[in-house]
Amino acid sequence: MKFRSFSALAPALIALVAMFSVAQETLAQEAPRVKFATNAGDFVVEVYPDKAPKTVENFLQYVKDKHYDGTIFHRVIDNFMVQGGGFDARYSEKKTRAPVAHEGREALAKGGLKNLVGTLAMARTNDPQSATAQFFINVKDNAFLDPSTQDFGYTVFGKVTSGMEVIQKIKAVPTGPAGPFGSDAPKTPIIINSATLVK
């Protein structure tokens, strides 16, 4: 009788264990999220270490080191992108670690994101291996920035998950020359008060 009772319960127990395992796996795979608090409002991004592991590790280390706190969006181009993470409000360039390896092609090959509206990508110079701390958020679909067999493109490693209206507000601010920049700098600084890992 006891054996029969256990046999009847066995499928339910197996299902419960399976559900618990799936839940654990889902939690383990959940993307890290970073909250940016700015003087224009807050927004949250999530990043994908399974697609661009070195880039995400680099970015999150800068977050943990408080590198982004007090930096500005120094390059804002409506109908293109908003860029920040490299200069403070006095337009002094912040020190960075060594560049991170470019992962754009590898990320796309793993099913990563393209440079679509709301995506987060690494900024760099003309040297594909020069990305350090600066990032940009696409405010339109910018397919010409995507990696290809002929071009390295720009590594996309995350996207905005909440507060996109703040990015829309930032992209529309009046811009002009400021600091070392001849154009595209907000006339009223857009300051990142803090960048915090929330998961």
For the regions a protein language model found, what residue spans apply to each?
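Cyclophilin-like peptidyl-prolyl cis-trans isomerases
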Residues: 2-8, 16-199
